From Swiss-Prot:
Protein name listed in UniProt: NADH-ubiquinone oxidoreductase 24 kDa subunit, mitochondrial
Lineage: Eukaryota, Fungi, Dikarya, Ascomycota, Pezizomycotina
GO cellular component terms listed in the entry, alphabetical order: mitochondrial inner membrane
Matches recorded under InterPro entries: NuoE-like, NuoE_dom, NuoE_N, Thioredoxin-like_sf
One Pfam family linked to the record: 2Fe-2S_thioredx
Gene transcribed to yield this protein: nuo-24
Region listing for Disordered, in residue ranges: 224-263
Species per Swiss-Prot/TrEMBL record: Neurospora crassa (strain ATCC 24698 / 74-OR23-1A / CBS 708.71 / DSM 1257 / FGSC 987)
Keywords: 2Fe-2S, Electron transport, Iron, Iron-sulfur, Membrane, Metal-binding, Mitochondrion, Mitochondrion inner membrane, NAD, Oxidoreductase, Respiratory chain, Transit peptide, Translocase, Transport, Ubiquinone
Domain of life: Eukaryota
Subunit structure: Complex I is composed of about 40 different subunits. This is a component of the flavoprotein-sulfur (FP) fragment of the enzyme.
Length: 263
């Protein structure tokens, strides 16, 4: 049956195509889908290393004497045959000493842990906390995930305030080398949204005014450490307590409970 139908279907299709080709087209042109492409994340922009004057294998790197002692303690935590498991803390240590996780830092970590350099590169290129390009003294990372977009004044307003105050766009560093700004995904402080991580500190419950105050204070702290801003909520609340204040566990705590009264 299928064999008999095939010639018929082919003839029908050819005739239909011929008619369409001889008549003016009445079919509306198909519009191309408009794709929305977000800005490239700095963590995605360097999946392959490219030598630069400030980041190439010819630049020597060695851990300081103090960090060598720290490395000895770190490696002791792992069995000798599995010391390569220390790759992440050693990369972090190298980044803190050098300012960023350069190719020379990765090669030195590979040498110390006796593992192929490519394995170290894989780790450093996978985790976004390793900065494989130079960053400023203050690495400003604004969370733009849903809770921060919806919480408080919203992360869009915070991002705009940062860009205006620093005069840079995402992924850029200020001319004085003090600030690098990027947008990141959730940093786990959703109850205190919107928030920003700067180096190792969280600044939460932000408004355009408070984030500008934080950035100004950080700049002043370069010459006067006492000017450094206090991390945490900038709204005055304690950690992540309810905005309405304490609503539970308001009474004095009971004493330790025991199973037997004679204990």
């Amino acid at each position: 049956m299928a064999t008999k139908l095939t010639p018929f279907l082919m003839r029908t299709a050819v005739r239909a195509a011929t008619r369409l080709s001889t008549k003016p087209s009445t079919i509306a042109p198909v519009s191309r889908a408009c794709l929305s492409i977000s800005a490239r994340r700095p963590s995605d922009t360097l999946m392959v290393h490219r030598n630069t004057p400030d980041n190439n294998p010819d630049i020597p790197f060695k851990f300081s004497a103090d960090n060598e002692k720290v490395i000895e303690e770190i490696i002791k935590r792992y069995p000798p045959q599995y010391k390569k498991a220390a790759v992440m803390p050693l990369l972090d240590l190298g980044q803190r000493q050098h300012g960023f996780c350069s190719i020379s830092v990765m090669n030195e970590v590979a040498r110390l842990l006796e593992m192929p350099p490519m394995r170290v590169y894989e780790v450093a290129s996978f985790y976004t906390m390793y900065n494989r390009t130079p960053v400023g003294k203050f690495h400003v990372q604004a969370c733009t995930t849903t809770p921060c977009q919806l919480g408080g004044c919203g992360s869009d307003v915070i991002v705009k305030a940062i860009k205006e105050h620093l005069g840079i766009k995402q992924g850029e560093t200020t001319p004085d080398g003090l600030f690098t700004f990027i947008e990141v995904e959730c940093l786990g402080a959703c109850a205190n949204a919107p928030m920003v991580q700067i180096n190792d500190d969280y600044f939460e419950d932000l408004t355009p005014e408070t984030i500008k105050q934080v950035l100004s204070a950080l700049k002043e702290s370069v010459t006067d450490v006492s000017k450094a801003p206090q991390p945490g909520p900038q709204s005055g609340r304690q950690t992540c307590e309810n905005a309405a204040g304490l609503t539970s566990l308001t009474s004095e705590p009971y004493g330790p409970e025991v199973t037997r009264s004679d204990l």
